[in-house]
Amino acid sequence: MSKNSKAYREAAAKIDAGREYTPLQAAELVKETSSKNFDASVDVAIRLGVDPRKADQLVRGTVSLPNGTGKTVRVAVFAAGEKATEAEAAGADFVGTDELVERIQGGWTDFDVAIATPDQMAKIGRIARVLGPRGLMPNPKTGTVTNDVAKAIEEVKGGKISFRVDKASNLHAAIGKASFDAKALAENYGALIDELLRIKPSSSKGIYLKKITMSSTTGPGVAVDTHITKNYTAEA
């Protein structure tokens, strides 16, 4: 939906630009203003009161969304032997070691999440320049470098997402699909906010949640009340 299109203008007209909505109200508006041509992703953009140039304020982590993401997550697992067998049994889409590295060196990145056992990280270092910029590099902090590959696969396929603040102090995350009911979206939103508050850097001063906007992939943004940090599915 182009911002210059009639459909976009009509959708934007349904939103009070000077108002902050409850998470549930925002989810309802996002659903109402989303394109009807496809099942759009529902995203949140959050401006945090942190300075990501400081190591102790680089907000990053993971959260399991209670209602999943609505996406089919393709998982590549770097593992050998027994761990490779476990990964295959757990539903990994691609499993291997050197052969996976070689495919990626050749330009292939047709997966959404990469998981690796610790003993494979030296090999993965050869493709860090490919995986890193795409947000695909396995990392112990996000639970994607682990010997418990079955659990990691179950989590990412079940709705576990990663997030990280960017250089401009903004954080973006997908919390579901426009086909979700509004309550499910509000619950997923709440899980993300709860986790962000849990890991708030102690050195962060002033307002932490500065601005939050919820939108579909192509729809207009809806401002969410940053003061609501519980009862996310309440009407008002």
From Swiss-Prot:
This is Large ribosomal subunit protein uL1. It holds the Pfam family Ribosomal_L1. Part of the 50S ribosomal subunit. HAMAP family: Ribosomal_uL1_B. GO terms for molecular function: rRNA binding; structural constituent of ribosome; tRNA binding. Keywords: Repressor, Ribonucleoprotein, Ribosomal protein, RNA-binding, rRNA-binding, Translation regulation, tRNA-binding. CDD domains: Ribosomal_L1. The keyword Ribonucleoprotein applies. GO terms for biological process: regulation of translation; translation. Belongs to the universal ribosomal protein uL1 family. PANTHER family: 54S RIBOSOMAL PROTEIN L1, MITOCHONDRIAL (PTHR36427), LARGE RIBOSOMAL SUBUNIT PROTEIN UL1M (PTHR36427:SF3). It comes from the Bacteria. Binds directly to 23S rRNA. The L1 stalk is quite mobile in the ribosome, and is involved in E site tRNA release. The keyword Repressor applies. One of its GO terms (cellular component) is large ribosomal subunit. It comes from Corynebacterium efficiens (strain DSM 44549 / YS-314 / AJ 12310 / JCM 11189 / NBRC 100395). Coiled coil: none annotated.
